[in-house]
């Protein structure tokens, strides 16, 4: 197997503005540089007074070149969402998708990975952490592409809308259970945001360590019994690993299992039990990811990620009005005033898999973890590992058993499946090798080189 090229969808819109600091060759046979703008109109790409179905711009051979894209959104639907100008190596393609244009970056997988590990965390992170992240990002990409490319032709035939895959079932007046996963994009391999893997080209500097990490692990992927691992990862597990089936489809992966994020403290309470989960979440158990070390955190988190100060244990407070309006807005269901939020099922990390919302107008069980997080936040609640306390006003509400305030005390940041980025950063600082980090978070997996 030779090193693959990858196509990355960066942004979409009616108009896309980009620039070339040095000369690029266009697919229509011209050499161009400087600022350019393409516009979607009447089913065509309009550029320099002419119409096209597709355009591509390639750096000239031997020239160190990059292009810039304006108004790229990062952190889509997260609390730190913003737009910025981004820089990319490789080829730029402009295509038509629906009634808008999409900008696609064509780049080698190893160059892509250098950016991904720099975009997912600071490129100044420890070398062993960056090596581990290079392996899991490469594994995720190759495992997904093998599966998704087989589906791609079917998607093109059915013209299914380009979106995150999800499955759900709804039992009227009883339950709404939904999970979200990655699905094939019709016209490119992956997108550039957290839906796939966070990719920002060369916007943020790739340090010699990031380059070394990708080079040292070139072609390496995680394997389990002859298949590439589905190498999931999140920011902070909260001290315990979640299992795959509690977040996505009901399939168990033997390398994504219940375990404590520690080498010294092996015993993990049964967090499926409500009393044990309550105690776990309200305390601060020993774990690799239980750290406030600013040096380590600055290596793992980019500036906008550091806007989240509390991630191992956190609190969110809502007034009755705030919560009832939020749930109504996010779910599209009017529950009336919220009487209670009751855990129905927890996973192996204490994360809620199913949550019962009791209102004055109706009651409904929702899940899985991301649906719960989306329902209880304007973007994404840090995790679904939380317990609920209620406050009552002295007069009025208490007699009606209507809480005046809900306080959520939670653990971790993200789904908690697979590698814990904060925990892995601590392991790297403590001298663990990348192979040891990977075997800790993906027990039973092995390393294998797919290409030279």
Spell out what each predicted region is.
Residues 1-452:
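Conserved, single-site charged/polar hotspot
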């Amino acid at each position: 197997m030779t090193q693959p090229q990858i196509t990355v969808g960066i942004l979409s819109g009616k108009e896309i503005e980009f620039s070339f600091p040095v000369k690029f060759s266009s697919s229509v046979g011209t050499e161009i540089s400087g600022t350019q703008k393409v516009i979607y109109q009447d089913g065509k790409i309009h550029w320099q007074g002419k119409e096209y179905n597709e355009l591509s711009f390639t750096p000239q051979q031997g020239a160190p070149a990059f292009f810039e894209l304006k108004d790229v959104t990062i952190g889509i639907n997260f609390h730190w969402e913003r737009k910025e100008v981004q820089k990319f190596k490789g080829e730029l393609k402009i295509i038509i998708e629906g009634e808008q244009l999409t900008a696609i970056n064509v780049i080698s997988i190893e160059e892509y990975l250098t950016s991904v590990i720099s975009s997912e965390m600071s490129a100044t992170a420890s070398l062993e952490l960056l090596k581990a992240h290079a392996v899991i990002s490469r594994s995720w990409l190759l495992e997904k592409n093998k599966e998704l490319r087989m589906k791609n032709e079917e998607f093109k035939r059915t013209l299914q809308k380009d979106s995150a895959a999800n499955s759900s079932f709804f039992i009227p007046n009883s339950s709404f259970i939904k999970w979200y996963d990655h699905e094939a994009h019709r016209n490119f391999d992956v997108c550039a945001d957290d839906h796939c893997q966070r990719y920002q080209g060369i916007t943020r500097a790739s340090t010699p360590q990031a380059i070394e990490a990708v080079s040292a692990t070139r072609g390496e992927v995680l394997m389990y019994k002859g298949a590439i691992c589905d190498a999931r990862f999140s920011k902070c597990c909260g001290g315990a690993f979640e299992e795959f089936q509690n977040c996505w489809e009901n399939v168990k992966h033997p390398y994504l299992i219940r375990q404590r994020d520690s080498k010294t403290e092996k015993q993990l309470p049964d967090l499926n039990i409500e009393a044990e989960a309550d105690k776990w979440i309200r305390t601060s158990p020993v774990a690799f990811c239980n750290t406030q070390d600013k040096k380590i955190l600055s290596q793992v988190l980019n500036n906008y990620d550091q806007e989240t100060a509390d991630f191992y244990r956190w609190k969110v407070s809502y007034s009755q009005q705030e919560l009832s309006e939020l749930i109504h807005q996010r779910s599209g269901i009017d529950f009336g005033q919220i009487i209670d939020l009751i855990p129905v099922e927890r996973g192996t990390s204490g994360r809620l898999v199913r949550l019962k919302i009791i209102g004055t107008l109706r009651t409904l069980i929702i899940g899985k973890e991301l649906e719960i997080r989306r329902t209880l936040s304007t973007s994404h609640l840090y995790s679904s590992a939380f317990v609920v306390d209620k406050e009552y006003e002295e007069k009025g509400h208490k007699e009606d058993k209507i809480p005046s305030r809900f306080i959520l005390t939670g653990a971790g940041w993200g789904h908690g499946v697979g590698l814990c980025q904060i925990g892995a950063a601590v392991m790297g600082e403590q001298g663990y090798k990348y192979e040891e980090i990977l075997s800790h978070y993906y027990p039973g997996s092995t390393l294998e080189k797919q290409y030279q």
